[in-house]
Amino acid sequence: MIKEKGILFILSGPSGVGKGTVRKKLFEEETDLQYSISMTTRDRRPGEVDGVDYFYKTKEEFEQLIKDGQLLEYAQYVNNYYGTPRNYVEETLENGQDVFLEIEVQGALQVKENFPEGVFIFLFPPSLDELKNRIVSRGTESQELVLNRLKEARNEIEMMDAYDYVVVNDKVQHAVDKVKTIIKSEHLKRERIAKQYKKILEDGLS
């Protein structure tokens, strides 16, 4: 039995497009996927477990990891760092498990630069009007912030060319089914398994 290396899948798209909803539904149906655990410098909250909820680091440790190139992406939010640790992802992939990362567009572009062999999926809204409705329905943003998010979304949509696949999130189940198809298709790509099968042939002829 050939043991395939896992694949890193990155789901990204503008704020309000439904990344979290699609990811949660996907994980209900695809139990073999490993969700990427983020690293942070924020304080651990009651009940949180290191290596389960986050990997917790001091600011000094985190900044050293940045210098050492040990983060696939990182950002600073409310005076704390958040990022995706390279070692965790690479070790999980080597064990044959797929890793799934749900992230904002800017973070995805950082991952693309640091880990170009990942599979990048852009979650696209059915329309900008629908995206606006989804953001407004949260009830957490002012009108000014909604307009800023829509402006940012337009800019992010223009970055779609950096992705391998585009999935329109018109209905959650439709989007999930398309992502599942992408995962299956990627595992059947010739370049991913050719070396392994060629070795079997060579061993059989030797």
Curated annotation (Swiss-Prot):
E.C. code: 2.7.4.8
Catalysed reaction equations from the record: GMP + ATP = GDP + ADP
InterPro entries the record matches: GK/Ca_channel_bsu, Guanylate_kin-like_dom, Guanylate_kinase, Guanylate_kinase_CS, P-loop_NTPase
Entry's Gene Ontology cellular component terms: cytosol
Protein location: Cytoplasm
Disulfide pairings: none
Annotated Pfam families: Guanylate_kin
Keyword Kinase attributed: yes
UniProt keyword list: ATP-binding, Cytoplasm, Kinase, Nucleotide-binding, Transferase
CDD domains tied to this protein: GMPK
Superkingdom of the organism of origin: Bacteria
EC category name: transferase
Annotated residues for binding of ATP: 13-20
Any one GO molecular function term: guanylate kinase activity
Keyword Membrane: no
Record domain Guanylate kinase-like: where: 6-184
Family: Belongs to the guanylate kinase family.
Purpose: Essential for recycling GMP and indirectly, cGMP.
HAMAP family found in the cross-reference section: Guanylate_kinase
NCBIfam families assigned to the protein according to its UniProt record, in alphabetical order: guanyl_kin
Protein name per Swiss-Prot or TrEMBL: Guanylate kinase
Species annotation: Oceanobacillus iheyensis (strain DSM 14371 / CIP 107618 / JCM 11309 / KCTC 3954 / HTE831)
Gene that this sequence comes from: gmk
